[in-house]
Amino acid sequence: MNVSAIVVEYNPMHNGHLHHIKKTKELTNCDALVCIMSGNFVQRGFPSILDKWTKASIAISNGVDLVIELPTLYSLSSAEFFSFGAVSILDSLNIINSICFGSEIGNINALQDIASTLLEEPLEYKILLKNYLDKGISFAKARNLALVELNRDNKIMSENINKILSLSNNILGIEYLKSLLLLNSSIKPFTITREGADYKDENLHKEYSSASSIRKYLKENKNINILKDFLPLEGFLEFKRLITKGYNFSMEDSMINYIRYKYISGYKNLHNLIDVSEGLDNRIYKSLEKNFTYDSLVGEIKSKRYAYSRIGRILCQYFIGFENYDLNSLLKSTPNYMRVLASNEIGLKVLKKIKRHSSTNIYTKIPKNTNTLLNLDIKATNAYSLLNNNIRFNEDYFRSPIIIKNTIY
């Protein structure tokens, strides 16, 4: 069985994601497609607009065979740790033949060259990087300049490095490739050219609209019929069903009052979070005293040094309670389990294959004894239940994987 994998967030799933699924199947000629997906919080620093089980069900209805959860520790981490968490879980299964991701450049060789250099850090690169850093240049810019100079004999590559490293999906792709190299993985990487609007684009566009634009529309409008052109049919119908049911779409503004209450109640321990450098905690506290929306709060805190998504992840981590854990030790370890969210009949065959070839624990229900990584996921769902009326406290203990039979795609 030829098994391919994709790493996704689906916040929410749109036509661009459907294109990714179809192209992955064409490119890899796979018999089964495994999706490792962020759960109730996503890497850009938001609560997911739909809960993880609903997202997983929509994914299965649109061509994915097995959905497993990316632990919240990784889904709320930098691109480096987000990628490593996903790739290390996939690699541990010992049955994944390939991974396919979207990138703006759509050129796997160019991305692999950069990934190899950044991971191996050859002496010439180290010297160039140090020289630029000594001039007071920021790390990201110094890294780019060092790579350009290192590739000075390759005109096409040197001219495109800055462009490659300025685009988010390229950066994420490079991190996937670095993780594969670091793990000495046999998983073969593929990339497709990302189609449609930039993820920051908040305007709806014909055929391929960004997840941001769809979330913005849902936040401001009750009539969602216009979204039929931008969502897979099964996803659109699920949205309509949820609206009829009175489902609360989880929006980041809903989280802010809980965060403000936590702060004024005396929980001033942001400094325990990895991404909170000296002084950033006080900057956040001051902003919490006078800002009541996510955008105004993050907008006041962000700077050239502190990116929007980094601040968003910090707020989500604080909301969940990450500051009470030894995050450094957790991020240095590798996951020893996979959590199944949804499957079809092909996915069940994949699970049987994993059981034969891997020692990774497969969780379809929460075990009596949970490790720290899984405990964080449970805390994340409990925090998320404050934002989403469809999710109960301790929902993780009540839910079994969604099994959808006879899906034809």
From Swiss-Prot:
Binding site for ATP: 7-20, 102, 169, 194
Pfam families membership: HIGH_NTase1 (PF05636)
EC numbers on record: 6.3.4.-
One CC-aspect GO term: cytoplasm
Compartments, record wording: Cytoplasm
Superkingdom, taxonomy of origin: Bacteria
InterPro entries, alphabetized: Rossmann-like_a/b/a_fold, tRNA(Met)_cyd_acetate_ligase
Predominant place of localization: cytoplasm
Membrane-spanning parts: none
Broad EC category: ligase
GO molecular function: ATP binding; ligase activity, forming carbon-nitrogen bonds; tRNA binding
Alphabetical keyword list: ATP-binding, Cytoplasm, Ligase, Nucleotide-binding, RNA-binding, tRNA processing, tRNA-binding
Reactions mediated catalytically: cytidine(34) in elongator tRNA(Met) + acetate + ATP = N(4)-acetylcytidine(34) in elongator tRNA(Met) + AMP + diphosphate
GO biological process, alphabetically ordered: tRNA modification
Protein family per UniProt: Belongs to the TmcAL family.
Function in brief: Catalyzes the formation of N(4)-acetylcytidine (ac(4)C) at the wobble position of elongator tRNA(Met), using acetate and ATP as substrates. First activates an acetate ion to form acetyladenylate (Ac-AMP) and then transfers the acetyl group to tRNA to form ac(4)C34.
UniProt protein name: tRNA(Met) cytidine acetate ligase
Organism in which the protein naturally occurs: Clostridium botulinum (strain Loch Maree / Type A3)
